[in-house]
């Protein structure tokens, strides 16, 4: 077995070109056996900032007599040699070591990538949090040797996790990462080879299938249908459940009698029975959740009618569905059906996941997220994003490519192509049959904006955390786009040699006649050119917006809060704003021409979609 060196550095800052190393810690190990350690402070030849001293505990006096980095390099080079280097966010450490001429060709391993994949539901992936989660006997202290020891311990624990993975999933992760360098490839190859001494045969089997995809789809059943003759609630009878000596006090030991809760409960019961609107303010400690859940549940059961509850925060949504509603079920002792429904982007799409696997990952972010999916789905029964940690905008961009947020996939298409096993379809089925349905403000308002085409029919609505409704409405009814989003979209679109357009060309070669293929190739080349032109003109557009905002600040520095400007008629006459309009006209012109080319490509795909190839339908949906 080859030894590995876990390395951690403390530095004067984050940029290796402008900052330097102040401490080096390294641990050489083989399996779980520590072979040697290396530790030294480094004289940076400059002052250490108070921030770094507070973070690391390393001050100027401590490094004043320490050796310079040039004196340390020979010993560190001899300690590491050509062994693989392990780190947590290892690119950071290696970038500083490369800057002083060290270890430019060493293989690198990253415990961040390992943890992100093998612990898909971990709340945080920083070194300190992982050390606590995995019960590492050392603490991450922002001192180099301590953190190197924790990194080695995290590696050892995570490698044990890898050895416990199903062999077909390990094989699939190794196959998918075959042409992409990333920080955990060494670990999965090592684990696979240890479990299977035969040569790797990269199966394209359904390694991702887990409980949710193996269980039969839910049976189609009639949606909830309200009674015509509504049965009113007795407000005092409903609130008696929350009185001293009531059912709640007998079941739950933490019962506390709250007069305000009783009053709110009775008022909501009367509101439901009499059919009027209610605006109520409940202070902290009122117990408002139970005050509205109990009458809502009883009303929905008596009248076979749905009550929709909208919240602003995920925390409250989780509290309602995982704690409060189960308590209500126990309290009223009935067959209350309750579920939570989220936006499409919160659910995995197995069809898009399979298409993503077929094209193979093209970056470390893509292989990391895809590997995380395979491991998560071996256990998940929901396909719900809330179960896992998608960390940062780059991972979020990958998730967007495999989520159910696909306008081209309708319920009918989902049932036809996937047999109703899709997480979003299951969630909608549960919502259709629920007496109490929990959503968030964003989904509620999206349903309003689309003419009630998202949520099942409802007549009764309770808006909790209503003080956030105005800002949620602003967000729901507005449009937002950023320069990085445009650049990611253009990259995904690609051209003749990469991305979506390249996949369209590749698939079409097996179907189209030479003349039609040549025409498609020409259109794709035109689309590639227009995409490049739009990308450049959109950059100029955002630059002009930046110049306009800077002009509006009139020399003032940008503060902590974002800068807001209302575009009123007087603003539109200013030269900086005229530059914005001119740059947008150019970007818009390129975008329109790009759309025209994409429409022509889509028309070609439509003509050949009757060949029965699902990949054509996937490409049409993506484009």
Which residue ranges define each predicted feature?
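Acidic two-metal-ion nuclease catalytic site recognized across multiple nuclease folds
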Residues: 156-235
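Conserved non-catalytic scaffold segment of RNase H-like nuclease domains
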Residues: 1-107, 113, 120-142
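Walker A/P-loop NTP-binding motif
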Residues: 269-270, 289-303, 323-327
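Conserved pre-motif I regulatory segment
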Residues: 232-280
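Signature of the SF2 helicase/ATPase Hel1-core->accessory helical subdomain module
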Residues: 292, 298, 318, 408-436, ...
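Walker A/P-loop
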Residues: 274-295
